[in-house]
C-alpha cells in the first residue's frame, strides 16, 4: 500500500459548507475511490489557516490518477469550486507532501 498526504485550501467562509458536502460524500464517488484502490482516506481541517490536510492509502499511482478522469470525479470537482481554490480543470489546488516519518 502506498501512503499519500496532501494539502488543499478551503475558502475562509466555507468551512461548514465544505464539511456538510463531505458528510457523506456522494455514494458513487465513494464507490469510484474504492474501486480505484483508495483506502483509509481522511481529510482534516485547520480552521485557523483555512487548510485541508488529506491522507489516503492507495494500491497504485496509476489507479489513483485514473480517478480524475471519471465522470463522477469531474462533477465533484465542479461542485466544490465555490468552496475552495481550483485549477483551470476544476481540480482542487493541492500540494503533495513528502513523508518524513512513519511509525507502523
Curated annotation (Swiss-Prot):
One of its GO terms (molecular function) is L-rhamnose mutarotase activity. The active site is at residue 22. It is found in: Cytoplasm. It catalyses: alpha-L-rhamnose = beta-L-rhamnose. One of its GO terms (cellular component) is cytoplasm. Gene3D superfamilies: 3.30.70.100. Pfam families: rhaM (PF05336). Pathway: Carbohydrate metabolism; L-rhamnose metabolism. Its main location: cytoplasm. SUPFAM superfamilies: Dimeric alpha+beta barrel (SSF54909). Belongs to the rhamnose mutarotase family. Involved in the anomeric conversion of L-rhamnose. NCBIfam families: YiiL_rotase. This is L-rhamnose mutarotase. It comes from Escherichia coli O8 (strain IAI1).
Amino acid at each position: 500500500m502506498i501512503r499519500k498526504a496532501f494539502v488543499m485550501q478551503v475558502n475562509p467562509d466555507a468551512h461548514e459548507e465544505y464539511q456538510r458536502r463531505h458528510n457523506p460524500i456522494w455514494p458513487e464517488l465513494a464507490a469510484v475511490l474504492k474501486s480505484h484502490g483508495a483506502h483509509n482516506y481522511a481529510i482534516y481541517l485547520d480552521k485557523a489557516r483555512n487548510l485541508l490536510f488529506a491522507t489516503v492509502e492507495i494500491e497504485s499511482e496509476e489507479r489513483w490518477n485514473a480517478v480524475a478522469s471519471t465522470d463522477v470525479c469531474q462533477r465533484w470537482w465542479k461542485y466544490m469550486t465555490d468552496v475552495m481554490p481550483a485549477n483551470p480543470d476544476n481540480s482542487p489546488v493541492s500540494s503533495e507532501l513528502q513523508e518524513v516519518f512513519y511509525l507502523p
